[in-house]
Amino acid sequence: AGLLRAPAAATLVRALRERFDLPVHLHTHDTAGGQIGTLLAAIDAGVDAVDAACSSMSGTTSQPSLSALVAATDGTERPTGLDIDKVFSLEPYWEAVRTIYKPFESGLASPTGRVYFHEIPGGQLSNLRQQAIALGLGDRFEDIEDMYAAANRILGNIVKVTPSSKVVGDLALALVGAGADPADFEENPTRYDIPDSVIGFLEGELGDPPGGWPEPFRTKALQGRAAKPRHTELTPEQESALATEPRRTLNQLLFPGPTREFEASREAYGDLSVLGTIEFLHGLEQGTEYEAEIEAGKRLILGISSVGEADRQGMRTVMCTLNGQFRPVTVRDRSITADVKAVEKAD
């Protein structure tokens, strides 16, 4: 989150140096805007490595500016050894890349000192804003920040790093969405619909928190729930799959929900990673041709020839081109409201 102040960084690095004969590597985000000072203090104290970001991608929920760090340490006893002109030359490229990913920005136009209050990690802040927008809470982000601080306190001020930070974020979103009073929730948690991630945390799925369990809240929240085993044994099939498909199997074990969604998408649409970033995130422009290499030496030429009018169900016929051949595709235009109600099909 970028909560480590410069004096504390110096104290921490020196203490680690005295106790451990290991490299010390400092990573911090720059949400409040003061972390270049923290890095410099850590460098003076003997840190071995620090993380920084290309200037055009730096600041706020990212890392401090690499250009600033190189310039600040040049001529000192501990320079980075990087050529500052070469570092500068990277900035235009990453500035262009950043415009492509603009929809996923955190929404922070400048540093904010509120991070010292709500303690939302930098990597989570942008994700949390996108989650809030998806839940229709995008215009209540200050309320979510306040509730995040309350949720963090209720859960015992836990160490917030994935996946524990998600637990706090899920609870904050749920309480804001329900219009809940955090004090009442803490006193009477069984009256509320508690997110699964919070229940899992309280049941010990993430291990025992360093500061102990938040009691009596934990006991109240788990009241009437059947205890789950702390560890799940792998089936013979899963053990075999780990040897042959380790990445896919680990995804299924660690993130079952997102993995199912990903595999359903790939089953329906194929491997979309062959598309360019702009085409994938922003769609195809009518009248423009695109190339996609689906395998070594095999390229497809894609395009959109025309887009038909929407019908009462909000469906449009899009005339696509594939290697010069026309292919009609019917898609739902989610920007318009359909007149006909959709009925869920039975299994």
Question: What do the predicted segments below correspond to?
Answer:
Residues A109-T112, E119, G123-T337:
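Terminal or standalone catalytic/regulatory effector modules within metabolic enzymes
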Residues G37, S62, A71, T80-L137, ...:
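Core active-site phosphate/anionic-ligand binding loop and the adjoining beta-turn-alpha structural block
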Residues L22-T28, V50-A52:
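Hydrophobic faces of well-ordered beta-strands that scaffold small-molecule active sites
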Residues V343-D347:
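Structured functional modules or segments
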Residues G46, L69, Y148:
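Conserved, mostly hydrophobic/aromatic
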Residues A32-V47:
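Catalytic cores of alpha/beta
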Residues G2-P7, D30-Q35, S56-T61, R114:
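Short, small-residue-enriched loops and turns at beta-alpha junctions
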Residues G2-F20, G59-A68:
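Active-site-adjacent beta->alpha loops and helix N-cap segments on the catalytic face
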